Design a protein with these regions (language model features):
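Glycine-rich cofactor/substrate-binding loops
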Residues: 30-31, 43-203
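Acidic, glycine-rich loop-and-beta core segments that form the ion-binding/anion-interacting portion
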Residues: 1-66
Length: 203
């Protein structure tokens, strides 16, 4: 059960490493800002920087913890002829493995406490992402029996930056009821949610 415990904690740590990296990335592209802490140094050469140091520390300490925990999980079920003493050597590192995990959790909590969403930056990206409307358009096209609906939207939008005009030009080529066409033209990247709200409420 001790080995199983370390395997489970290592998996949880891995999930949190993924979270720390994602949050670091969102900070880097401006989706989140961090509250400044008086006296904190973000960079040794760039005084203006507010680095995501807590998320970097969390990632590093989760990594060290997992290196120990994965070894504990793999080593403890094995005993040479059921009598060797390597377990006692390895078990001396239990405290370190748990300690690094706790340090990482504290860093993560501290970092989360500094986060503030930058709604303007997020909305700016969303408002320019007209290609997300390919989903409702191809769904309506299928409903009205238009062949190769998915493929048509894929050819139009995949790897492309769309805008309102280019999307509306495509809509004008479709044989759809007028009311349906106007409903699609009224959609914007900001207003279209699809099933996002329903799926989020089910988490």
């Amino acid at each position: 059960y001790v080995a199983e415990f370390f395997d489970v904690v290592a998996r949880l740590n891995t999930i949190l490493v993924d979270y720390a990296r994602d949050t670091w990335s969102y900070i880097s592209i401006g989706y989140f800002r961090q509250h400044q802490v008086a006296g904190e140094i973000g960079s040794s050469t760039m005084p203006h920087k507010v680095n995501p140091i807590d998320f970097e520390n969390a990632e590093g300490n989760f990594g060290v913890a997992n290196a120990l925990m994965q070894h504990l999980g793999a080593k403890l079920p094995i005993s040479r002829w059921q009598r060797d003493l390597t377990d006692s050597t390895v078990l001396r590192n239990v405290g370190s493995a748990i300690g690094y995990t706790l340090i990482a959790l504290n860093s993560l909590e501290r970092g989360i406490g500094k986060l503030q969403p930058d709604n303007d930056a997020q909305l700016a990206d969303l408002r320019n992402a007209w290609e997300v409307l390919a989903e409702p358009i191809q769904t309506v096209m299928r409903r009205y029996g238009i062949e190769n609906s998915y493929e048509a939207l894929k050819d139009l939008t995949r790897g492309q930056r769309m805008d309102r005009e280019s999307l509306h030009r495509f809509l004008d080529t479709l044989t759809l009821p007028g009311a349906e066409l106007q409903r699609l033209k009224a959609l914007t990247p900001e207003s279209y949610l699809g099933l996002a709200e329903k799926l989020a409420s089910e988490i």
